[in-house]
Amino acid sequence: MGEQATYDHHAIEQHWQREWDDADVFRVPDDADDPEYVLAMFPYTSGQLHMGHVRNYAITDAFARYRRMDGEDVLHPMGWDSFGLPAENAANERDTNPREWTERCIDQMRDQFEALGFGYDWEREITTCDPDYYKWNQWLFTEFRDAGLVDRRAATVNWCPSCETVLADEQVEGDDELCWRCDTPVTERDLDQWFFETTAYADELLDGLDELDGWPSNVRDMQRNWVGRTDGVEVPFTVHTPDGDEDVVAFTTRVDTIHGATYFALAPDHPLAEAAADRDDDVAHFVEEVADPDGDEPQGVETEFTATNPATGAEIPVVVADFVLSDVGTGALMAVPAHDDRDHEFAQAHDLPVRQVVAPAGDEDADVEAAAYTADGVLVNAGDYTGLDSETAREELTADIDGAASAVQYQLRDWGVSRQRYWGTPIPIVHCESCGPVSVPDDDLPVELPEFVHTTGNPLDAAEDWKQTTCPDCGAPAVRETDTMDTFLDSSWYFLRFASPAFDDAPFDTQRANDWLPVDEYVGGDEHAVMHLLYSRFVTKAFADLDMLEHREPFAGLTTQGMVLGEDGTKMSKSKDNGVAPERIVDEYGADTARLFTLRAARPSKAFPWSEEGVRSSHTFLERLLSMARAVNADATADGDLDPAAEYVARETAATVQAATTHFDDMEFNRAVQAVDELVSLLVRYRDRDDAAPAVVARGVTAAVKLLAPIAPHVAEECWTALGGDGFVAEAAWPTPDRDVSDHDRATSLIEQTREDVRDIVDTAGIENPTGVDVVTAPEWMYDVLARAKAADGNVVGSVMSDQSLQQHGEDAADYAKDLAAQAPAFPDVLGPDGERDALGRAVWLLEAEFDAPVRVLAAEDAADSVANKAEPGRPAIHVDEADD
């Protein structure tokens, strides 16, 4: 391929993909010692990649390739999240079955991945709808059930009438409570459901977030808010009904305000609210017809019941209110209108009393009739507790109120995993009239899906032959569970299976999982923060408690990628017709162009708009690099010391290697590409000089090719071959700087500032034909003044002028010291005098090329005083000669 004269991306990419495949370049051996584990969230098998997919998988591929070149064994696998309702719907629409549809989609997507050159270990490919995989979903279910982490109970659940299935809380989105999949408004149903008891791990799920330093803070915050730990106090109130008294516990975070509780509120579905509805038509009408927890205003109705405030002994009314939720707290609350905004709004609407019991500390006042005072303060009108601060009052009231106790509440709910659809993992339970629900024995797993039948409702419920079975315990006739598992269970542990995809004795080889996990770098969207990522953490912790894992967190590092937007800056969508098909870009420009553009446009976490101009620019850049590599004298060697221009280029090459390596470590591929782009531009300029050193050009181009290899791997392989490289560049050693470039940033700043100063002089003076440029560095004593100023403890001028060697420079030294004192502590960070002259000397060729005039770099003592007196450390003086008219 290296003999081609043009950039034929079709031929180049197909060739190198075959070569990589034949050589098993991306295969990681089973005996690898703790390989770097790089993983992108595996795709749902929709059958069609979009540009967001390209970006997501280009990110992990670039990082995996980099780490491989840097000497690591790398585990970079791919699999298919292949169960789910969309495949079932597609099968119904096309008169096929979900398995055939899914397999076609997988074949198509695999071809697309391979066309993009992603380096996966395909020997580890997994597919969640394969019985060999979902057998272990079922095993996990029964093991977790034996451990007390799975329970079946009647519950009010979220129901999507369009999908005809239950949704977990995490799958109901937004204030409008829409289905996460189809945007249908979600309703509620009472059903017997299977639950994973995620709440058993609530504290650890919350506390463990503090240790996940490699995760974005916004994802950790989303999980914190979702778990929603609240510390408070449970206080029993005695509710008086015509049928007798009943103690009802209310949860509060502000027990210090209990003296101000003027009514007691119940959720509409609280048992006492239902009892009140049985006795009062107004309450029944409210509960059945009016209550709206999502309404803009709190609504409610007073009952004939009363409650006793345990702090005051006062009788207070009991109301049923729709702002009280049965699944938040206890479904009952003490209402304190003076110190809670919602309680205040309701009290005003229903003419209930407002009693202030907390006042601001100090002279500030609060008009609680006008608005609730919700901050802590000092108790008033609170009997023996008057005068206490809120915190102290909370402690004493908790201890003093009979039956009160500190408590913790969570927003997190158990994970309902029952789904009333076909295309998912059958729940491995048999229902026996005598024995109840019985787990299917391990030896009988997997319970495979029956043949698909087009029907309405729950398809498995219609599969009579499949459904009828015998009880594993007593042998009596029994019925299989007809619900399937939430497909998020499939993805909650798949990353463990990649370590040992053919393991037959358990979901994964424990020893290898302990050695290879957690995942070092995981990439996917932050929309998975409170579903997939939370479930994966729960399952990992549960596996650890079953002694199957040593670690308790699945992902050490997490990167959440931003969207690829349309050229109009909005989200790509069919309705807006602003999408871009990856196939078109790959066909027209090549896979490397698609990869390069998506990685150079922005850092992974940021969204960016699509740009055809940016795509063309990326393609042009690759053409230029390939052309340079083919023209380089790869056998050239450097004889003796390099001249200043060659040394400049050699240093820039070394600095680019160092900078790009840092950017790759940080997954800032856009900055790495920018550094390589600048190096290539410099090499083009230098290569065209008559005295260019071929070995320096070859070294620079070779470094650029290696640095670009993780991002544009096909072109990099073609360049590597042209440069005479051995084997694959994908397996070549990552470049390292061959020079000390610790002063590179200061040298670059000096050179750029000097070039800008020359430009300003030429432009301001209107010099059209400069005949010479003198760049004069400051006298050495000024660097000594700067050093003394940096070491001074406050009195810069005094410190400088106490130095006898500087006193001889009199007012000049004092004036410079005063200038520095005004800048303290932000002193200029500069090279020494020799360092400045060396750096500028290496850059003379750039200045001469830009201004088309000879350039001299002079020490102050070698220049005219009128010029030298203007120089300062880090800011040489400039003199430009021009031709006489």
UniProtKB/Swiss-Prot annotation:
A motif ('HIGH' region) lies at residues 43-53. GO terms for molecular function: aminoacyl-tRNA deacylase activity; ATP binding; leucine-tRNA ligase activity. Keywords: Aminoacyl-tRNA synthetase, ATP-binding, Cytoplasm, Ligase, Nucleotide-binding, Protein biosynthesis. A motif ('KMSKS' region) lies at residues 571-575. It is found in: Cytoplasm. Residues 866-885 are annotated as: Disordered. The keyword Ligase applies. GO terms for cellular component: cytoplasm. Its main location: cytoplasm. It catalyses: tRNA(Leu) + L-leucine + ATP = L-leucyl-tRNA(Leu) + AMP + diphosphate. It comes from the Archaea. ATP binds at residue 574. The keyword Chaperone does not apply. PANTHER family: LEUCINE--TRNA LIGASE, MITOCHONDRIAL, LEUCYL-TRNA SYNTHETASE. Belongs to the class-I aminoacyl-tRNA synthetase family. This is Leucine--tRNA ligase. It comes from Halobacterium salinarum (strain ATCC 700922 / JCM 11081 / NRC-1). The gene is leuS.
